[in-house]
A protein has these predicted regions:
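S-adenosylmethionine/decaboxylated-SAM
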Residues: 1-142
Length: 142
């Protein structure tokens, strides 16, 4: 399952020297590649997801949406109850200010048990020979 509201239409790297093909219509480009019937796609703001939008509580979540502290906090806070009782959460762009900190606050607020985590932080932004802008991988239990 994927969720997007297409609020970010300017998809490109921060560094100008990094080659990235121009994507004129990210929605059309994504949906063209999203034809496998095993997957569902929900076009709405993540904060307005309901249990009716998903068929089962996901146990593996890859989050690559807003990464400002409050944006990520509000997004995850809105959907954490939709996740399975034990789940893997992968946060993209963990190098960005607020990503790791907002996740720590979500863990506290929802009294989640941190079973395992790995922070893969990089020193060079958008390094195509490394983990781009970092990842934080967590195994959590409600």
């Amino acid at each position: 399952m994927a969720v997007d509201n297409w609020c970010n239409t300017d998809i490109k790297p921060m560094r100008e020297e990094v080659f990235f093909p121009t994507i004129k219509d990210p929605r059309k480009d994504f949906l063209y590649k999203f034809k496998d019937p095993r997957w569902t796609f929900v076009e709405k703001d993540i904060r307005s997801l309901t249990p009716r939008d998903i068929c089962d509580k996901p146990n593996i979540i890859f989050y690559d949406a807003g990464h400002e502290y409050w944006e990520q906090y509000e997004n995850l806070d809105a959907v954490i109850d939709l996740f399975a009782d034990k789940f893997i959460l992968i946060l993209d762009d963990a190098n960005f200010n607020g990503v790791v900190t907002s996740m720590e606050e979500i863990i506290k607020k929802h009294d989640l048990k941190l079973i395992w985590q790995r922070k893969i932080l990089t020193t060079i932004p958008e390094d195509d020979k490394d983990w781009w802008n970092g990842l934080q991988i967590l195994v959590l239990e409600k």
